[in-house]
Regions:
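Sec-dependent signal peptide recognition
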Residues: 1-7
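Conserved, mostly hydrophobic/aromatic
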Residues: 83, 180, 193, 226, ...
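Catalytic-core regions of glycoside hydrolase
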Residues: 28-68, 79, 115, 192-202, ...
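Active-site groove signature of glycoside hydrolases
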Residues: 148-212
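Extracellular/luminal regions of secreted and cell-surface proteins that mediate adhesion/ECM remodeling
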Residues: 358-494
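Bacterial Sec-dependent N-terminal signal peptides
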Residues: 10-35
Length: 494
């Protein structure tokens, strides 16, 4: 019914706003009016699990906090939404129980620098030292008797790495993850965490075992370890790793509510099978995207020249293809990455940076509302509302650890600016608002208990785990806002 009504109203009130009506006119109830809302597309709109990310990608030395934020300050404030820490376990816990968030002053400054700039945190903590400047696993694990092997580090170094199924390694890592979750299972400051990080670079490849028959068992152990400790943060894993997507889906996605990440965008490493999985999983799980090529932005270093699928001639070509993959396959995030890559993106492809600021991830808002402007005390009235997502991705409200916590709501504020009452539309589901689709809803609200007087209607997407306070920025143009609520119309109760 509402789709027909809304189509009628959009036709009759095109180009107008706050259109009044008489009883039944144009299908709008007596005492109600149609309100046409415009999206604010003026710039950065931060929301959880979306947008550009800045990195400390510590295959070399970890970043110096003061130098890092001096270089990344502008990008952090103008473009980015999250700060991704990809560190060795040996940096996060160099000695048993000596955690970086307690004892490492540089680490604490890096984290605080992100939070001070309004960025959420994201993490991958890995144990394998391949291509690293130093060992990925703390030395105390080997000293405790864990068995391992050597991988190739930087400068031809041989770096010890534990077998993934070694019981001592597993015991020590479980202890670390429990402490890690105690500090960071907090959606107020953390967006997502990589809940599988074995193998080279933490991407699930070239994993070695004491018993190769334990691959699936070890994968289950690792993902269980993270999922039992992190109850409030979305967990993701690199998909199509060597264990195979069927196992990833069965154990991590279906059983434990994991999302996906792909670290090979803009390259031959993003395969047709990767594309197929991304298409199949869009709207079902969060998908985190990352460019394959990094480490430079000038002709002095061009690792993409060996790409057998794309004939890249410059870093700008790489940026174009990476952006296209993120847009086409609906990845919620993309990486400005470290200082070097940020210079490349912002210097060579500023138009792509801005496009992803405006359209990366999700950007949702109510396009149209039909609601009362007057009613009698105690009356039950209806509110009809239509929502649109102009982003490439989606709002992953259906992820297990979010558990549908975000919902559209309308509220009445009195003349002093105090919130009197709010009503959540439980049937309106933001995770269903896929790219450039509209979803329409109608629900009834009771004005029982609200005194006669003048009020203002406001709209928000609230977080049910935070006492129904606004939790998602919706960006409506030319409307007054207060504490995350956007005022859209006046209301009189007689």
């Amino acid at each position: 019914y509402f789709q027909i009504l809304l189509a009628c109203c959009l036709t009759l009130f095109a180009g107008c706003s706050d259109s009044d009506s008489e009883s039944g006119q144009n299908g709008i109830p007596k005492g109600s009016k149609a309100i046409d809302l415009q999206q604010d597309r003026s710039g950065l709109l931060r929301n959880p699990c979306m947008g550009w990310g800045l990195y400390d990608d510590a295959v070399g030395n970890v970043a110096n906090a003061e130098e890092y934020w001096a270089a990344q300050d502008e990008a952090a404030r103008n473009y980015a939404s999250f700060f991704y820490i990809r560190w060795r376990w040996s940096e996060m816990e160099p000695e048993e129980g000596k955690y970086a968030w307690i004892y490492d002053e540089n680490y604490k400054k890096l984290i605080q620098g992100a939070l001070d700039r309004g960025l959420k945190l994201c993490f991958r903590i890995y144990d394998n030292g391949q291509d690293n400047i130093r060992q990925g696993t703390p030395e105390y694990v080997r000293a405790a008797g864990a068995q391992g092997y050597e991988v190739e580090g930087q400068n031809n170094a041989k770096l010890w790495t534990p077998y993934a199924d070694d019981p001592i390694f597993q015991q020590k890592y479980e202890k670390f993850v429990a402490a890690f979750a105690k500090e960071y299972d907090n959606p107020d400051i953390v967006d997502f965490i990589d809940g599988h990080s074995l193998g080279w670079w933490g991407e699930g490849s070239h994993i070695k075992y004491l018993n190769s028959d334990k691959k699936k068992e070890t994968f289950d152990w690792f993902t269980t370890m993270y999922s039992k400790n992190f109850k409030n943060i979305i967990l993701v894993l690199p998909y199509n790793s060597e264990i195979g997507f069927n196992t990833e889906k069965e154990i991590a996605i279906d059983q434990k509510g994991y999302g996906l990440r792909r670290d090979g965008l803009g390259s031959m490493w993003f395969t047709e099978n990767d594309e197929k999985v991304a298409n199949e999983m869009y709207g079902k799980v969060l998908m985190v995207g990352e460019c394959a090529y990094w480490g430079g932005y000038t002709a002095a270093y061009e690792p993409f020249k060996n790409d057998t699928k794309y004939s890249f001639k410059s870093w700008k070509d790489v940026y174009n293809q990476s952006f296209d993959h993120a847009q086409t396959y609906h990845f919620n995030t993309l990486d400005l990455r470290t200082i070097t890559e940020t210079k490349g993106w912002t210097g060579l492809a500023p138009e792509l940076v801005r496009k992803f600021v405006l359209n990366g991830g999700y950007r949702v808002y109510p396009t149209y509302v039909i609601m009362p402007y007057e009613a009698s005390a105690g009356q039950t009235v209806s509110i009809s509302h239509s929502w649109r997502n102009t982003g490439y991705g989606y709002l992953p409200n259906n992820m297990k650890n979010w558990n549908y916590k975000y919902k559209p709501a309308f509220a009445l504020f009195d003349e002093s600016g105090k919130l009197v009452k709010s009503w959540i539309d439980e049937d309106a589901e933001p995770s269903q608002w896929l790219s450039n689709q509209r979803k329409n809803y109608t629900y009834e609200v009771s004005l029982d208990g609200i005194s006669r007087g003048n009020y203002q209607w406001a709209v928000a997407i609230v977080d049910k785990t935070k006492d129904n306070q606004p939790g998602i920025n919706i960006g409506i143009k030319d409307k007054e806002k207060k504490d995350g609520w956007t005022f859209i119309s006046e209301m009189t109760i007689k």
